[in-house]
């Protein structure tokens, strides 16, 4: 049997001090083994320092750095989470109008024995796969496929679980010709009408209308290092300052992090990620997600269909409310 292939880690810029420390630990171990010297005490101190440094780095990430984590090539995807948390699931294809968009996937499954419908944006793992899935940017056919599956869920009384991970809806000429804006708008309208619980989770990046197309729900959840924004920081910087190089400044101003959105009352719960991000321990992350989804589903299933629709409507009506000073 062939030995398992170990993937080379993909490092982010701000992780370099940590990597240098870990490489130093490895070098000391190697030298100690070659020379039969006991340096266990020194290694123990360095390992403790590495853990502390990792904790310091990931607890003080800037919005721009969180975007890097949200876009990490090995961050768990929609299909990763569905396969990890579901008892079983069957992917369903097509919008029944000649399209099957691979950038938006969905199907029927079971979560803790309960039938549900899963939906989500799907990015690729490498360049070839990303081209196939259009980098997670869904077309009108993708949103119409999502609507078909959500209508199926509503008809048979199955909760809807959506996973958001897209830089935005596909903005090509072909998408506009096929009615991208209309497809997203119809989804927004219909999601307010459904009588089943809807849980929306931002698992990576939630970009603009592309995220909203499957983002109207009774609860909005976000992973700790995910982002949710009206426009990418690069696009925002290009529009406001005519300089994409100011993306970090735009990321700060846009209030895109889970912490920011929780303070603004947009987000219902932040799902904690393992130290180092979701990609560092995907199975642990998936189990955390599963527990949170089950808890919220239990709360929502205690409500009548009319209560669900009314609370969902009021949740979105209250977004953007602010008070002006009388001074």
UniProtKB/Swiss-Prot annotation:
GO terms for molecular function: acetyl-CoA carboxylase activity; ATP binding; carboxyl- or carbamoyltransferase activity. It holds the Pfam family ACCA. It catalyses: N(6)-carboxybiotinyl-L-lysyl-[protein] + acetyl-CoA = N(6)-biotinyl-L-lysyl-[protein] + malonyl-CoA. Its main location: cytoplasm. Pathway: Lipid metabolism; malonyl-CoA biosynthesis; malonyl-CoA from acetyl-CoA: step 1/1. Keywords: ATP-binding, Cytoplasm, Fatty acid biosynthesis, Fatty acid metabolism, Lipid biosynthesis, Lipid metabolism, Nucleotide-binding, Transferase. InterPro entries: Acetyl_CoA_COase_a_su (IPR001095), ClpP/crotonase-like_dom_sf (IPR029045), COA_CT_C (IPR011763). GO terms for biological process: fatty acid biosynthetic process; malonyl-CoA biosynthetic process. Residues 46-299 form the CoA carboxyltransferase C-terminal domain. It is found in: Cytoplasm. One of its GO terms (cellular component) is acetyl-CoA carboxylase complex. SUPFAM superfamilies: ClpP/crotonase. The keyword Transmembrane helix does not apply. Its EC number is 2.1.3.15. It is an enzyme of class 2 (transferase). Belongs to the AccA family. Acetyl-CoA carboxylase is a heterohexamer composed of biotin carboxyl carrier protein (AccB), biotin carboxylase (AccC) and two subunits each of ACCase subunit alpha (AccA) and ACCase subunit beta (AccD). Component of the acetyl coenzyme A carboxylase (ACC) complex. First, biotin carboxylase catalyzes the carboxylation of biotin on its carrier protein (BCCP) and then the CO(2) group is transferred by the carboxyltransferase to acetyl-CoA to form malonyl-CoA. This is Acetyl-coenzyme A carboxylase carboxyl transferase subunit alpha. It comes from Synechococcus elongatus (strain ATCC 33912 / PCC 7942 / FACHB-805).
């Amino acid at each position: 049997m062939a030995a398992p292939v170990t993937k080379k880690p993909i490092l982010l810029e701000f992780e370099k001090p940590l990597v240098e420390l870990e490489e130093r630990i490895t070098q000391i171990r190697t030298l100690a083994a070659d020379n039969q010297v006991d340096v266990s005490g020194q290694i123990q101190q360095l390992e403790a320092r590495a853990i502390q440094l990792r904790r310091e780095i990931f607890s003080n990430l800037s919005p721009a750095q969180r975007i890097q984590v949200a876009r990490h090539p090995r961050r768990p995807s929609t299909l990763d989470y569905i396969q990890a948390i579901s008892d079983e699931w069957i992917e369903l294809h097509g919008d029944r109008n000649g399209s099957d968009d691979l950038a938006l996937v969905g199907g029927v499954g079971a979560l803790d024995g309960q039938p549900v419908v899963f939906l989500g944006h799907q990015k690729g793992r490498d360049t070839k796969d990303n081209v196939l899935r259009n980098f997670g940017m869904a077309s009108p056919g993708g949103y119409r496929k999502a609507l078909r599956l959500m209508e199926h869920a509503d008809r048979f009384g199955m909760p809807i679980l959506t996973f958001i991970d897209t830089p935005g809806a596909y903005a090509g000429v072909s998408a506009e010709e096929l009615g991208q804006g209309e497809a997203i708008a119809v989804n927004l309208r219909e999601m307010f009408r459904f009588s089943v619980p809807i849980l929306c989770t931002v698992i990576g990046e939630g970009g603009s209308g592309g995220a909203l197309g499957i983002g109207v729900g009774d609860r909005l959840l976000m992973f700790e290092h995910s982002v949710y924004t009206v426009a990418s920081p690069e696009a925002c910087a290009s529009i406001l300052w005519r300089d994409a190089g100011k993306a970090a400044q735009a990321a700060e101003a846009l209030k895109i992090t889970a912490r920011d959105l929780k303070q603004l009352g947009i987000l219902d719960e932040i799902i904690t990620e393992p130290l180092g991000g979701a990609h560092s321990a995907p199975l642990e992350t998936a189990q955390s997600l599963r527990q949170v989804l089950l808890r919220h589903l239990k709360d929502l299933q205690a409500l009548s269909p009319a209560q669900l629709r009314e609370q969902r409507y009021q949740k979105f009506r209250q977004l953007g409310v602010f008070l002006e000073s009388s001074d």
